[in-house]
Every structure is written in structure tokens, then in C-alpha cells.
Amino acid sequence: MMYREPNDSPWGLVVRCDTLCPGVYSVSTAGHGGIMAQIDAARQLLSLEAQQVGFQAGGYLNFEEDCDASVALRELMDSGIIAPRTDNYFRPGEYEACIDRSLQRWNPAYWRARQKRLSVQAAKATKERER
């Protein structure tokens, strides 16, 4: 599949676009922004619960920056596609904690589904180790 960086977004003309991974972009406009994932990339990379948080527009699944972008970021970090941010602002562990607090506040249904999914994965891993 050929991916293309967006020039336009649901929030306006894209003035900055950073590729998070093929088909997934962090975009900024003059006044807003978010995460844009091409539909086929979103279906491959994001859980159904995460996909339900985003909204479709222009061939992308979109997650606005204030409340919903953290869903896409958490999914990409959980799968190891992107690393948690560490820099002069975020020390190790702080970025993930910030993302998790945002999810718990703005997307509690997604947070609960994620926690349940992680519990099931941990139980399966434990069972495999015991064999």
C-alpha cells in the first residue's frame, strides 16, 4: 500500500506533518491538529476500541489533539511501533503517565477495554510459561 502525508485535515490546512509510522501522521494546522491514520493503516495497527474513538474524514481515521490523540499514541507505544517520548520536558516514564492520565479522563471506555486486553494477554503469557 502506498501511503501519503496529508496536506489537508479536518482541522484545516496542514502546516506541519510528522510521520509516526507508515500511514500514521501527527499533524498541526494554524490552530489545531491531531493524529491522522490512513484507513487501511488504522485497521492494521489499532484495536477496534481505538478505531471507535477516531472519526473518519478524507480517507483517514482522525484523533483530535486535545482528547483523542492519546488513544492512537498509546496503541502505537503498546505495540512498540513508536517509543515513548523522552526529552528535556519528559523524563523516562513521564510521557506514558501523561498519556495514561489523559485516557483515563477523556476516554475511560477505551482505557477499561485496554486494561482488560492487557490482563488477558498477561494471563495467556503466564499460562504459556507454566507449560
Identify what each model region corresponds to.
Residues 14-15, 24-27, 53, 71, ...:
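Extended aliphatic helical segments
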Residues 10, 20-22, 57, 88-91:
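Sparse, context-dependent recognition of short Cys/His-centered cofactor- or disulfide-binding micro-motifs
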Residues 64-121:
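Short, compact, well-ordered microdomains
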Residues 55-65:
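A short, exposed loop/beta-hairpin motif centered on an aromatic-Gly-Thr core
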Residues 29-57:
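A short, structured beta-strand/loop element
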Residues 125-131:
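Non-Sec secretion/translocation targeting segments of pathogen effectors
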Residues 2-40:
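Short N-terminal "domain-start" leader segments
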